[in-house]
Swiss-Prot record:
Disulphide-bonded residues: none
Subunit structure: Homodimer.
Organism: Chlorobaculum tepidum (strain ATCC 49652 / DSM 12025 / NBRC 103806 / TLS)
GO molecular function list: aspartate-prephenate aminotransferase activity; L-aspartate:2-oxoglutarate aminotransferase activity; pyridoxal phosphate binding
Cellular component GO terms, alphabetical: cytoplasm
The protein's name: Aspartate/prephenate aminotransferase
Length: 400
């Protein structure tokens, strides 16, 4: 029997899911680089900086001391306490140890939440552009993603009116990702409070993905909905060490939420992966409790790169950028390029544009289709200024 014949045995939940486009494009770019092609990759969703030395040393020390066995399923107390201190220091949030769970990366923390709260028929409101995994995680939990399209005019932020229109009796979760991957949008306090007023009293949970909270620009700071006392019982805060501390491969994410939700996620995790990596947990303590000046140094470097990309891309005909307030992506509208012919092919959507840039000009980007925004591209500026300048030059040439 062929592979295709056997695929009929796959579950409905798998068949309904899509592969992560960011991982797909990044993998293709790395393959081309391995073949000797001079690809400038702006597709990766991870910092180009190394993990801080003190964090690496903490991991090495954990290995040398034999801290290599199972830990408590929900994380070691030492790390939970460090997370609590971080949330107090950086986010103005107060949590207890039994309101924290440590997971194998932010993805697992988010997936645990959907599995804990959603049943078949429930609806999850997801503003677009969205991180690629949000709708797929909702589907994995047998819920239905309800996509709310935002626009460049609103800075890619959902309005209270849009939220109100999307709510039905089946609404279970509102996903709020601030700073946003892919747009870099950050909801300020007034905007968050306005959204929360719409759902207050409606028994709707808020999944607040705050993974990029320490990478913001121009004095902007994200406001967590968990800071609103009457909403805190309905908010699940998701975060991790991946982005702020360049620890994507260490796989440490966490949730802060009401105890009963944490207990449910703990149960799910105990039957899937068990605890997060013991060595990485020790390293994460060093990251959260160590000298934070390196986080600010790297944030400042990202800001320089953001300013460069915003300035240069906006000089290319057919491309329009908003200024990202956080994260390390720029999400230009390429509406002005669509319908035109480049490289002998009509650019129908962002996938065509991304494929053209990669195959003809060796610049890896991620098509906006993956984020629910077919007229945009996501470009990561987690690369050196020299690499960014080369990428911009190639993009300019591609569309000249």
């Amino acid at each position: 029997m062929s592979v295709e014949s056997f695929e009929r045995f796959l579950s409905r939940r798998v068949l309904s899911m899509q592969e992560s486009q960011t991982m797909k494009i990044t993998g293709l770019a790395k393959k081309m680089q391995a073949e000797g092609k001079d690809v400038v990759s702006l597709s990766a969703g991870e910092p180009d900086f190394p993990t801080p030395e003190n964090v690496c040393e903490a991991g090495i020390e954990a290995i040398r001391k034999g801290f290599t066995r199972y830990t408590a399923n929900s994380g070691i107390p030492e790390l939970k306490k460090a997370i609590i201190r971080k949330l107090q220091r950086d986010n103005g949030l107060e949590y207890a140890e039994d309101e924290i769970i440590v997971s194998n990366g932010g993805k697992q923390a988010l997936a645990n939440t959907f599995l804990a709260l959603c049943d078949e028929g429930d609806e999850v409101i997801v503003p677009a552009p969205y991180w690629v995994s949000f709708p797929e995680m909702a589907r994995l939990a047998e819920a239905t993603p309800v996509i709310v399209e935002t626009s460049i005019e609103t800075g890619y932020k959902m309005t209270p009116e849009q939220l109100a229109a999307a709510i039905t009796p089946k609404t279970r979760i509102l996903v709020l990702n601030s700073p946003s991957n892919p747009s870099g949008a950050v909801y300020n306090e007034a905007e968050v409070r306005a959204l929360m007023q719409v759902i207050e009293g409606k028994e709707i949970f808020v999944l607040s993905d705050e993974m990029y909270d320490m990478i913001c620009y121009g004095g902007v700071r994200p406001f967590s909905p968990a800071r609103i006392p009457e909403m805190k019982p309905w908010v699940i805060v998701s975060n991790g060490t991946s982005k702020s501390y360049s620890m994507t491969g260490w796989r440490i994410g966490y949730l802060a939420a009401p105890k009963w939700i944490i207990n449910a996620c703990d149960k799910i995790q105990s039957q899937t992966t068990s605890n997060a990596n013991s060595i990485a947990q020790k390293a994460a303590v060093a990251a959260l409790d160590g000298d934070q000046s390196i986080v600010e140094q790297r944030r400042a470097e990202f800001e320089k790169r953001r300013d460069f990309m915003f300035r240069e891309l906006n000089t290319i005909s057919g491309i329009e950028c908003t200024l990202p307030e956080g994260a390390f992506y720029i999400f230009p509208s390429i509406k002005g390029l669509l319908g035109k012919t480049f490289g002998g092919k009509v650019m129908k959507d962002s996938t065509d544009v991304a494929e053209y840039l990669l195959t003809e000009h060796y610049v890896a980007t991620v098509p906006g289709d993956a984020f629910g925004a077919p007229e945009n591209l996501r470009l990561s500026y987690a690369a050196s200024i020299e690499e960014l300048a080369e990428a911009v030059n190639r993009i300019r040439k591609a569309f000249s």
